[in-house]
């Protein structure tokens, strides 16, 4: 685990990503999260295992390019994000949707 997130693992994970592709991946025990762009794979693994009490078997990360945004004549960039696809061990799961 890197020094940046020492003792602050809850700051690593921003939110789960719920898309059609991510929902299909739930069937094969893969969960997609938006994480801090400075987080390394060991940070993400430690945060997921500690927050959700599961065993992580693999992580794939991707850094999509920043998107430009305009507000009138002013141009800017959206915040940098990193996506992490987390594979869990057999028998583990994360409750993303409330039971109705």
Curated annotation (Swiss-Prot):
Question: What InterPro entries does this protein's entry cite?
Answer: Nucleotide-bd_a/b_plait_sf, Ribosomal_uL23-like, Ribosomal_uL23/eL15/eS24_sf, Ribosomal_uL23_CS
> What name appears for this protein in its UniProt entry?
Large ribosomal subunit protein uL23
Extract one GO cellular component term from the record: ribonucleoprotein complex
Function, as annotated: One of the early assembly proteins it binds 23S rRNA. One of the proteins that surrounds the polypeptide exit tunnel on the outside of the ribosome. Forms the main docking site for trigger factor binding to the ribosome.
Assigned protein family? Belongs to the universal ribosomal protein uL23 family.
UniProt subunit comment: Part of the 50S ribosomal subunit. Contacts protein L29, and trigger factor when it is bound to the ribosome.
Q: Check the record and name the Pfam families matching this protein.
A: Ribosomal_L23 (PF00276)
Record-level Gene Ontology MF annotations:
rRNA binding; structural constituent of ribosome
Q: Which GO terms describe its biological process?
A: translation
Q: What is the lineage of its organism?
A: Bacteria, Bacillati, Cyanobacteriota, Cyanophyceae, Synechococcales
Keyword RNA-binding on entry: yes
Going by the UniProt record, its keywords in alphabetical order are: Ribonucleoprotein, Ribosomal protein, RNA-binding, rRNA-binding
């Amino acid at each position: 685990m890197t020094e940046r997130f020492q003792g602050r693992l809850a700051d690593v994970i921003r939110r789960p990503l719920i898309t059609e592709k991510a929902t299909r991946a739930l069937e094969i025990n893969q969960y997609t999260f938006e994480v801090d762009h400075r987080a390394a794979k060991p940070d993400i693994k430690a945060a997921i295992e500690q927050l959700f009490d599961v065993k992580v078997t693999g992580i794939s990360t991707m850094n999509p390019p920043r998107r430009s945004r305009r507000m009138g004549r002013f141009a800017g960039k959206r915040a940098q994000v990193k996506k992490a696809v987390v594979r869990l061990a057999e028998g583990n799961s994360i409750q993303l949707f409330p039971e109705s």
